[in-house]
């Protein structure tokens, strides 16, 4: 009876890297308005663990759910999709 637990993963953009070993990731999703039918964007911010402080603002990253690491942090950055382009 060894059941594997499904791990939730999300993709988002790092909006803040000012904390030590933590980044703030903005995850956007598209939702259809229940009455008017227009597709609208909804977003939510997650604090994610970044052990080596390697991700910077603007990076597109993949985060996965984990055990609670602090009061507000229950996600871990698992991969980099795209580096931020510097202007």
From Swiss-Prot:
Gene: rpsQ
Pfam families noted in UniProt: Ribosomal_S17
Subunit structure: Part of the 30S ribosomal subunit.
Function description: One of the primary rRNA binding proteins, it binds specifically to the 5'-end of 16S ribosomal RNA.
Superkingdom as given in the UniProt entry: Bacteria
The name this protein goes by in its record: Small ribosomal subunit protein uS17
Similarity comment: family membership: Belongs to the universal ribosomal protein uS17 family.
Gene Ontology CC terms: cytosolic small ribosomal subunit
Keywords for this protein: Ribonucleoprotein, Ribosomal protein, RNA-binding, rRNA-binding
Keyword RNA-binding appears in the UniProt entry: yes
PROSITE patterns registered for this protein in UniProt: RIBOSOMAL_S17
Organism, scientific name: Chromobacterium violaceum (strain ATCC 12472 / DSM 30191 / JCM 1249 / CCUG 213 / NBRC 12614 / NCIMB 9131 / NCTC 9757 / MK)
Example GO biological process: translation
Gene Ontology molecular function terms on file: rRNA binding; structural constituent of ribosome
Classification lineage: Bacteria, Pseudomonadati, Pseudomonadota, Betaproteobacteria, Neisseriales
């Amino acid at each position: 009876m060894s059941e594997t637990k499904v791990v939730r993963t999300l993709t988002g953009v790092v909006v803040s890297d000012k904390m030590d070993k933590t980044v703030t990731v903005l995850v956007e999703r598209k939702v259809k308005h229940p009455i008017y039918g227009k597709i609208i964007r909804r977003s939510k911010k997650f604090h994610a663990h970044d052990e080596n402080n390697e991700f910077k603002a603007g990076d597109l990253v993949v985060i996965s759910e984990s055990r609670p690491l602090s009061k507000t942090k229950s996600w871990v950055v698992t991969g980099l999709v795209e580096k931020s382009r510097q202007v």
